[in-house]
């Protein structure tokens, strides 16, 4: 019998395809720079800001490394979560985490005054998936890439989240939107507990 967790379910598959197509468009087509310009998420008072960017920015990536690691994590954790949550609930969860990530990043902009922010990438949504995996499978072991050691999912989520918060708070993370990563995790955690309260899921 085939193990469904080894297969790629429809929402994850379509998200992978759309992200790949958009990345090729921004990298290869003459209008690629304009897609990035108008699709990225900006501070709300920036003349380039539009509400649709809370969704469009999730499908844009800065470079190959950026999209590779995001899509690898989407494939790795998304397969399991879509089978468990169902395609509809998984899709809702993904976009809530992604949009929530953008909201928290813009909220920090209002405090730091860095109004030139241009946010791209599915990292916030993917961090929400990582959080969900850690909540639903706390004792499942994840094999790290560097160093190649196994660690329980719950500890990996806690450590990763703490590092992201520290880097965001200290400003040591360069151009990486660490508070967007934290935002994706927080919105994901809130949604999971809301669903549990409504008896939609159990953990």
PLM features: residue spans?
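A detector for small-residue-rich transmembrane helices and their helix-helix packing motifs
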Residues: 1-203
